[in-house]
């Protein structure tokens, strides 16, 4: 029979090297939920690890968020917010996600916004940063925002878009770029 070490692989290797006896427990009934719970005591799981555990379990909506993350190169936390129609992620959303109760409600809108972020990335290398994504999602939600106007301004004035310290600073930077008027030469 094949045996697998679920937790403590590195500890086992270290004990082998120094010749210390190893205590172990053999269980045939371990489930991925048990492993997740076991590991959360020793080391915090990343959102990607939670995602993959739910994908393996076949939890609805998780295979779609996995596709979204891989297709658009957007991090898990930002993808959760986008796919639920938010401009930022909350602890409540993240807990719901970890517990396998994530529901995707805004795939079409999130995909449209992700395509726009991809387009922005051509002109601004930090377009995939968390602060920028949360800022641009807030801007996209503004009814008076015109995408074509913005991308035209960005393509002609990309040097005006710079790394910012916060989401709010990015919103101010985006607004300045959006309202930027070309300098008129007076002769």
Annotate each predicted stretch with a short phrase.
Residues 1-187:
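Accessory terminal alpha-helical modules
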């Amino acid at each position: 029979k094949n045996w697998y070490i679920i937790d403590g692989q590195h500890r086992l290797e270290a004990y082998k090297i120094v010749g210390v006896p190893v205590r172990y427990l053999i269980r045939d009934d371990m489930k991925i939920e048990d492993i997740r719970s076991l590991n959360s005591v020793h080391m915090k799981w990343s959102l990607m690890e939670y995602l993959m555990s739910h994908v393996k379990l076949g939890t609805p909506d998780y295979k779609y968020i996995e596709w979204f993350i891989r297709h658009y190169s957007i991090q898990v936390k930002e993808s959760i917010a986008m796919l639920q129609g938010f401009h930022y992620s909350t602890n409540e959303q993240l807990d719901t996600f970890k517990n396998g109760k994530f529901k995707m409600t805004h795939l079409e809108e999130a995909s449209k916004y992700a395509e726009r972020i991809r387009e922005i990335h051509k002109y601004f290398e930090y377009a995939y940063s968390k602060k920028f994504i949360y800022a641009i999602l807030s801007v996209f939600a503004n009814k008076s925002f015109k995408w074509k106007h913005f991308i035209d301004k960005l393509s002609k004035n990309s040097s005006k878009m710079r790394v910012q310290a916060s989401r709010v600073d990015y919103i101010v930077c985006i607004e300045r770029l959006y309202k930027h008027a070309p300098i008129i030469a007076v002769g």
